[in-house]
């Protein structure tokens, strides 16, 4: 499907950007094709009227742990113990995976189109990335780091 985003205020993300109006953003196959004057013939596009709302380039979050909501912890917790509990049964793994998928979707709905995961639960991040790419889940692009590396202590 081809879309034309109209009646929006465009912020282009450049250093000296100025809000731009009277333009349409043309999207084909999920990618921006062009930005054209709003007088352009749009008969091949489904019109999405932004009603004066802002539109800007997708944001990138370069440090994400999808196992958490991103909100500050109210108190210190033993993460290793918590991970062991979560990963100990199929029920808790299923619940945790649904939460991880929800946190990723929240990122996308907040304007973040790419997240860089830097450690998560088991293979959740990789599985979610694959499901998003297959179109079975909704979420941002995810370059996955999978697991962390630890250097041995040098005596």
Regions found by a protein language model. Give the residues of each.
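Conserved beta-strand scaffold positions in the cores of enzyme catalytic domains, especially
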Residues: 4, 45-49, 142-144
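Alpha-helix-loop-beta-strand connector modules within alpha/beta enzyme cores
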Residues: 135-140
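N-terminal metal-binding scaffold of metallo-dependent hydrolase/deaminase domains
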Residues: 1-41, 55
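Conserved small/polar residues in nucleotide/adenosyl-binding loops
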Residues: 147-153
């Amino acid at each position: 499907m081809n879309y034309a985003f109209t009646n929006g205020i465009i912020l282009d993300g450049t250093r000296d950007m100025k809000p731009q109006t009277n333009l349409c953003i043309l999207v084909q196959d999920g990618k921006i094709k062009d930005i054209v004057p709003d007088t352009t013939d749009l008969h091949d596009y489904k019109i999405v009227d932004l009603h004066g709302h802002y539109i800007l380039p997708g944001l990138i979050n370069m440090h994400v742990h999808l196992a958490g909501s991103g909100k500050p912890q109210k108190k210190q917790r033993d993460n290793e113990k918590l991970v062991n509990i979560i990963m100990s049964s199929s029920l808790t793994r299923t619940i945790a995976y649904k939460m991880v998928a929800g946190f990723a979707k929240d990122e996308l709905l907040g304007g973040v189109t790419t997240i860089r995961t830097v450690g998560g639960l088991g293979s959740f991040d990789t599985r979610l990335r694959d499901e998003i790419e297959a179109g079975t889940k909704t979420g941002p692009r995810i370059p996955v780091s999978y697991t962390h590396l630890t250097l041995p202590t040098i005596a």
